[in-house]
Amino acid sequence: MSVTLDLSRVSSDAAPATPVTKPLINLSGLTRPQLVAALVESGVVEHGKAKMRATQIFRWMHHRGVTDFADMSDVAKETRARLAEAFTIARPEIVERQVSKDGTRKWLIRMAPGIEVESVYIPGVGRAGALCVSSQVGCTLNCSFCHTGTQPLVRNLTAAEIVAQVQVAKDDLAEWPSDKEDRQLSNIVFMGMGEPLYNLGQVADAIEIISDNEGIAISRRRITVSTSGVVPMLEKLGSTTQAMLAISLHATNDPLRDVLVPLNKKYPIAELMAGIRAYPGLSNARRVTFEYVMLKGVNDSPEEARALVKLIKGIPAKINLIPFNPWPGSDYQCSDWATIEAFAAILNKAGYSSPIRTPRGRDILAACGQLKSESEKVRASALRKLSLAAMAGVLSDDDEDETA
């Protein structure tokens, strides 16, 4: 016996299907050429006027900082209405804002349900102040000294979500319009959650937007991208972004770096150094920054300091020495201050600038290693971290000369 089902018949009591609404594209994440294309493809602006309109809209978003198309007074009302129907320029939700006694500011930003990242503004770093931004939600690197870096990768951030971190900071710092002479935000460091070179396409677009002179206008020489050493992507990073390069080094030999930075097993030190030496634009005016966390009895001996000098010989560089901030369950301790100073003295004698940076924002849990343990007690669903280097003050006082 066969049975035939008539699937065309639906009960009159059945609820109608809910249409799936496609999220609006956030124009804040589009470079100017991408913005031109989006305006034409959407039919909001005719081709002949698209370039002019794109520049107007771009300036309103990134120079004036508006969050509503209705505020774009030199754009026709009809065009503004069509823009609002097709796109958005809204900011993400700020879940939490904290300000440290030392002026450090931290924002917990919800990009989407379950997608939260932290950004930190550190005053007095670089020319005026630096913002540490994230490029991914979660991380795949599993660096053994990093409490927060062991969290699983959720997804890459979009260019709009990266740029939004800058916009949120500028909102809070009252930094609009972007050409204010007394701006407090002068530098951007990609040292938050994630490995930027595993999301280079979106990172590169964000850098183009942030550095565009019609908008936020932060020079590419004041934008630093930190990597644990994704060697095949170094050349592309330099050629497409012209950003300053920072390397999370932390060891001078492969056996130790394999433990501290497991990515080293894939791209060992010799390969990493070759990639750094070939980095586009590397010069005394565009030095690479080596980040080196000071771990007691692990990588802090005078022999290690001399090995570091030998390793980077001939590379225009500076070394940021970062005191380790212990976290519960960690196998590591911070080097004694005298040990750190002795390490720095060896580097300085060899001609390398080697500032020692102490953590900033400890009272708002913005110091290295505090973010995962303390934040998860409050909000277990949030997957976020800020890099060790940024919290220790990635840029030294002499960076103003390099990034002017």
UniProtKB/Swiss-Prot annotation:
GO terms for biological process: rRNA base methylation; tRNA methylation. The active site is at 118 (proton acceptor), 368 (s-methylcysteine intermediate). GO terms for molecular function: 4 iron, 4 sulfur cluster binding; metal ion binding; rRNA (adenine(2503)-C2-)-methyltransferase activity; rRNA binding; tRNA (adenine(37)-C2)-methyltransferase activity; tRNA binding. S-adenosyl-L-methionine binds at residues 194-195, 226, 248-250, 325. It holds the Pfam family RlmN_N. The gene is rlmN. Specifically methylates position 2 of adenine 2503 in 23S rRNA and position 2 of adenine 37 in tRNAs. m2A2503 modification seems to play a crucial role in the proofreading step occurring at the peptidyl transferase center and thus would serve to optimize ribosomal fidelity. It catalyses: adenosine(2503) in 23S rRNA + 2 reduced [2Fe-2S]-[ferredoxin] + 2 S-adenosyl-L-methionine = 2-methyladenosine(2503) in 23S rRNA + 5'-deoxyadenosine + L-methionine + 2 oxidized [2Fe-2S]-[ferredoxin] + S-adenosyl-L-homocysteine; adenosine(37) in tRNA + 2 reduced [2Fe-2S]-[ferredoxin] + 2 S-adenosyl-L-methionine = 2-methyladenosine(37) in tRNA + 5'-deoxyadenosine + L-methionine + 2 oxidized [2Fe-2S]-[ferredoxin] + S-adenosyl-L-homocysteine. Reaction proceeds by a ping-pong mechanism involving intermediate methylation of a conserved cysteine residue. The keyword Iron-sulfur applies. Disulfide bonds join 132-368. Its EC number is 2.1.1.192. Belongs to the radical SAM superfamily. RlmN family. Residues 125-357 form the Radical SAM core domain. It is found in: Cytoplasm. Binds 1 [4Fe-4S] cluster. The cluster is coordinated with 3 cysteines and an exchangeable S-adenosyl-L-methionine. It comes from Caulobacter vibrioides (strain NA1000 / CB15N). This is Dual-specificity RNA methyltransferase RlmN. [4Fe-4S] cluster binds at residues 139, 143, 146. Its cofactor is [4Fe-4S] cluster. Keywords: 4Fe-4S, Cytoplasm, Disulfide bond, Iron, Iron-sulfur, Metal-binding, Methyltransferase, rRNA processing, S-adenosyl-L-methionine, Transferase, tRNA processing. One of its GO terms (cellular component) is cytoplasm. Its main location: cytoplasm. It comes from the Bacteria.
